[in-house]
């Protein structure tokens, strides 16, 4: 969400940014919101003048009423002024109603206008234009056939998709035995990994109010992703970054408290509307999963430094699990409206012989802070908006796919990397049961 003053003073820049994001249908919104803003400011000015006039006229009436004790003709003059005050009061009520209507319309439009992207963002309409930046680790190409990930899990009696389908429908799963333990081990390792980086571990609310969601994501994304609790102003979270950032809603943070660095575990719930291909079946794209997430609230001048640190930590974590990865810079058309800059970390799939997304790191500038009314009080006493960032530490369903494929041996066993062994009871290898 942009600052109205910034938009008013830079309409062409805002329009050019909309074009870069291939959202030309939003171009008329810029002129529309500027016109509404002008009308609103005119109404505010007139209302302010009427309030000042009311105060002056009220004093005048008081003087005339006092003078009327000696000069009754002053009563008639006072009554005329009272009539003017009444007319002004009626007009003031109209203006206050207009202001409310204008502000609601302005707010609604401002939520639709995308944030200004960073100059370094590549321009393109969709994720096909995302740019590979760097690879980390040599992609593995084994000399044996790697089964589909659910087949690997089934060889350990580790997954039951059929039972989950009967109980909950498509997009759910039961994890069992060593696979369930591996799932929890990855989460525990990721938690400790981030604590070692200086982050505060957090278990946040798993349901949040609608106004918090409006503050952290676009309405379109919200409608496509979120499950609403019927009859309640509550939504199941699609990612814990939303409830972690929401922790600071309406707060004034002392500058000395920055940066705020939180890492959280949570279940996540997503509608995942739309049809997907065979490679998005199994546990790749599902309605319920667990995730370790990180967020940072920081000074504006520090946000790009944090951005680079955060995605590099994702690379470090995956490499410690013997998973080759690459960094992809997201193009303009692939950025959600609140994002200034974003990159995906993709893991290597030896079975598909290609990379697939496992993490997403984003700098949202001051967009979330503006929507959520999060402010910082500087050492000089001045208020400003902080920047917010988020990054997936690990989402085990997709992580498990990458982990199993990259650590699978020809005999069907799976090697456990050294860093994960303490979380697996000292096991160095998982042996299939089938």
What would you call each of these model-derived segments?
Residues 1-140, 154, 158:
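N-terminal alpha-helical targeting/anchoring segments
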Residues 27, 135-434:
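TRNA-recognition modules of translation machinery and tRNA-sensing kinases, especially anticodon-binding
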